[in-house]
């Protein structure tokens, strides 16, 4: 199953969460997860509203005991790490806050860990981020794509005074992602802020593909509504769940980068692969080769989304001794993916399941989970694998 997020009218965390709930995520379970992170402080509720003739779900986040909005990244990390919530939700939420902190750090010229959040540090924004992460865990899409993001234009009042739209943090977060102003047709009037840092960070964390609706069999259409009822355009975010298995397999057009290197210290290669992944590579690998005059060498390769090509090229030049990089477009078809969780002596193991035409083709345990369980239980990784319950894909 795939998820496509339509942000052509903008995006905010509460709107995206409303859309995901409308598409089938369970509000009660989301509330339980949010409660585990910030106990007794936030109540989530939904309301069906109409925005310019379009029905949608308005999510209300009622903060019961909000004292201040200025929370450091370390404080929010501590809340998440100590919360008894699904590990996938926890890691995704940590990743989103890290993205925002990096963007804010660039804007203010300080280290991400020293950032103190303003609006994003409020209970309602924390609830939005944790809620969306849990909703996506529940829906479990194998592919997440999103449209170009409408940013708006003009100026708004914020914690740091009168600032331009897109606000500085959003401008950092959307680097490499297609955007549009979101201006109404035949109008030059400023439309204000359409995309918030929270909304943009959620898309950048989850979406691996940009562009129009990828096509397929639509199963659900969730509509999340904003607070304003803007004249001339519904103030909504759409979350469309679709089946890709029969009419549109998970096929992506990627760019393959390659370089032959014969003078690199071999001890550096593991770090090179890590650097390529950190720069945005979808996959990266090393192949032993023989070059002219029988010299042993390595071919380093990476598969990259078009939006990340320059970043990965820069990383490859910096991390190796190569003087040139080859590149070409390739298509990669993948299985539809979903995750199931099993328990081994109280430790969660994620199982990645691949299917095609609704038939399970492959089921593989996540090795990092196996390793963590082995260390915690004081047994071998092989023993952990042997204890994984059979029939998880049935």
UniProtKB/Swiss-Prot annotation:
Question: Could you tell me the keywords of this UniProt record?
Answer: Lyase, Nickel
Q: Does the keyword Lyase apply?
A: yes
The record's Gene Ontology biological-process terms are:
protein maturation
Q: Which InterPro entries match?
A: Ni_insertion
Q: Which GO terms describe its molecular function?
A: lyase activity; nickel cation binding
Its UniProt entry gives the catalysed reaction(s) as: Ni(II)-pyridinium-3,5-bisthiocarboxylate mononucleotide = pyridinium-3,5-bisthiocarboxylate mononucleotide + Ni(2+)
EC number(s) in its UniProt entry?
A: 4.99.1.12
Provide the family line. Belongs to the LarC family.
Role played = Involved in the biosynthesis of a nickel-pincer cofactor ((SCS)Ni(II) pincer complex). Binds Ni(2+), and functions in nickel delivery to pyridinium-3,5-bisthiocarboxylic acid mononucleotide (P2TMN), to form the mature cofactor. Is thus probably required for the activation of nickel-pincer cofactor-dependent enzymes.
UniProt name for this protein: Pyridinium-3,5-bisthiocarboxylic acid mononucleotide nickel insertion protein
Name of the gene this protein is made from: larC
